[in-house]
């Protein structure tokens, strides 16, 4: 029997901070399982989850407003340690008898916190010392309100010049609140504080490791599907590739991978996928030529959301057809990962706007005929990559830039046509090749080319011609929730532009996208 890697677990209640998923990833990096739930969870749900500790996230609301989110009262009655971060500290203070007010000065950015009192949370943790030997911590603040009175059974652990209660603690109950963000890298000792809370105060063991996650996933797959046959849509992306390798280890020849060349893939991608998974790893793969079918279904459609839904629908139709040709296929496997699950849950409960339909989760018809197997649904992307390495997949494949599920279907703006896809494939391949040559590929987080359905005049030789426009897009980001456009060298951009215009007949102009996220998204559609 495999070890119970979920035995020690942290519950993170989400109050809406852009950093909340980062908190969860940091806890996982410490080797401890955690889950992210909406703040209005019930007492029964908390009891059932049985956490070793609870973290209250930051959030954009003000605790001084009457209808602002509050932690369920049971959080403070469950007998487990609680760690409030920013808004989480404020609602903890207010709910336990303290006071919060809007601050005259909004604290945003670096701050130095002076530790005044010994506390299990920060004992022995410091960045520097004051002249009289008190520990100082370099932290990242982001708050407007501030705690002006702490609950009577708490002590002040640390303060800044403008924030009298930067850290508060009730050591007996093991309740802690910090007015800064320990999860961001700008808080230099943040990981040590999270480690102190999760590993020492909550006494969680580091059971959440790649090797143990693989063993657990294999055991769960076998328990779920038994001797049934499973079908998987293999795209060659990180998530579906790691899913394929896990299933192959768990059930061997009972897995049939369906690789659909939908006409929306990158240059030579179909050949590369078949070579690696069919020839090298020995997986059972059915190769479906689907370009004409997908492009016919997409004909005349300009709306990005509709295009995503069409691509998802046709994928499922293809799977159903392939499954009917095989005997006893009862399960459809997918590479759904934890951020997909979080976003889909948020949209289902109305707690967040649907930015885009996830190809894996929201875009699938509800009448799908097979059961779902999702072995990665508890994992963040960085965890999926680590597991892929452990399973023997090549580094370059696992750390390739993200590629959307609908592929070039959302990188060709407006209606998708074969001509547009062919031009885009070749232009994009040149851009990526040049990034590798210039040693820039791993210095940007994501880079790709977008086809714009507008013609622009160009001069070739002695003649004028009207041809298509493409845009290059490269961004730098830590979490893909916010992003800056990458400041690529002008000579590099010039070289890429010249190559595309000279080598791809049909493109007359190349532009570079200098939009950040927000207000733009990373993908154009």
From Swiss-Prot:
Pathway: Purine metabolism; GMP biosynthesis; GMP from XMP (L-Gln route): step 1/1. Transmembrane segments: none annotated. ATP binds at residues 235-241. Residues 9-207 form the Glutamine amidotransferase type-1 domain. Residues 208-400 form the GMPS ATP-PPase domain. GO terms for cellular component: cytosol. It is an enzyme of class 6 (ligase). The keyword Magnesium does not apply. Gene3D superfamilies: 3.30.300.10, 3.40.50.880, HUPs. Its EC number is 6.3.5.2. The keyword Repressor does not apply. HAMAP family: GMP_synthase. This is GMP synthase [glutamine-hydrolyzing].
């Amino acid at each position: 029997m495999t070890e119970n890697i979920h035995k020690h677990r942290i519950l993170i209640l989400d109050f809406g901070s852009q950093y909340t998923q980062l908190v969860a990833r940091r806890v996982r990096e410490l080797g401890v399982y955690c889950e992210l739930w909406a703040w209005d969870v019930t007492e029964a749900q908390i009891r059932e989850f049985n956490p070793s500790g609870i973290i209250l996230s930051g959030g954009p609301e003000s605790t001084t407003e009457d209808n602002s989110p509050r932690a369920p009262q049971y959080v403070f009655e469950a007998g487990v340690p609680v760690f409030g971060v920013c808004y989480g500290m404020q609602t903890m203070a207010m709910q336990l008898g303290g006071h919060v007010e809007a601050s005259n000065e909004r604290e945003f950015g670096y701050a130095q916190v002076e530790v005044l009192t010994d506390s299990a949370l920060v004992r022995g943790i410091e960045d520097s010392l004051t002249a009289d030997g008190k520990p100082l911590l370099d932290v990242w603040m982001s708050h407007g309100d501030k705690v002006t009175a702490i609950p009577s059974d708490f002590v002040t652990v640390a303060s800044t010049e403008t924030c009298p209660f930067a850290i508060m603690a009730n050591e007996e109950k093991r309740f802690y609140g910090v007015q800064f963000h320990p999860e961001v890298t700008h808080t230099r000792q943040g990981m040590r504080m999270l480690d102190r809370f999760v590993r020492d105060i909550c006494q969680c063991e580091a059971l959440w490791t790649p090797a143990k996650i693989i063993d657990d996933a294999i055991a769960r797959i076998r328990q779920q599907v038994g001797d049934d046959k499973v079908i998987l849509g293999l795209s060659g992306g990180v998530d579906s590739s790691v899913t394929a390798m896990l299933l192959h280890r768990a059930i061997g020849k009972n897995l049939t991978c369906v690789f659909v060349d939908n006409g929306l893939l990158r240059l030579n991608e179909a050949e590369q996928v078949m070579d690696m998974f069919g020839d090298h790893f020995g997986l059972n793969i059915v190769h479906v030529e689907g370009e004409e079918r997908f492009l016919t279904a997409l004909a005349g459609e300009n709306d990005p959301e509709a295009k995503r839904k069409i691509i998802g629908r046709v994928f499922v139709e293809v799977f159903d057809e392939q499954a009917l040709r095989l005997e006893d296929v009862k399960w459809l496997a997918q590479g759904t990962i934890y951020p997909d699950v979080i976003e889909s849950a948020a949209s289902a409960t109305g707690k967040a706007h649907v930015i885009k339909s996830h190809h894996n989760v929201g875009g699938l018809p509800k009448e799908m005929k097979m059961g779902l197997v999702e072995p990665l649904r508890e994992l963040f992307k960085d965890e999926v990559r680590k597991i892929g390495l452990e399973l023997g997949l090549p580094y370059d494949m696992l750390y390739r830039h993200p590629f959307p599920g609908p592929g070039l279907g959302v990188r060709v703006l407006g209606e998708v046509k074969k001509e547009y896809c062919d031009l885009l494939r070749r232009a994009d391949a040149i851009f990526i090749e040049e990034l590798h040559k210039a040693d820039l590929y791993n210095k940007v987080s994501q880079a790709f080319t977008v086809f714009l359905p507008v013609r622009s005049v160009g001069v070739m030789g002695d003649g004028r011609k009207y041809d298509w426009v493409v845009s290059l897009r490269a961004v730098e980001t830590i979490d893909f929730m916010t992003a800056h456009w990458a400041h690529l060298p002008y000579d590099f951009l010039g070289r890429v532009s010249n190559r595309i215009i000279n080598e791809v007949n049909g493109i007359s102009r190349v532009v570079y996208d200098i939009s950040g996220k927000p207000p733009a998204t990373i993908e154009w559609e």
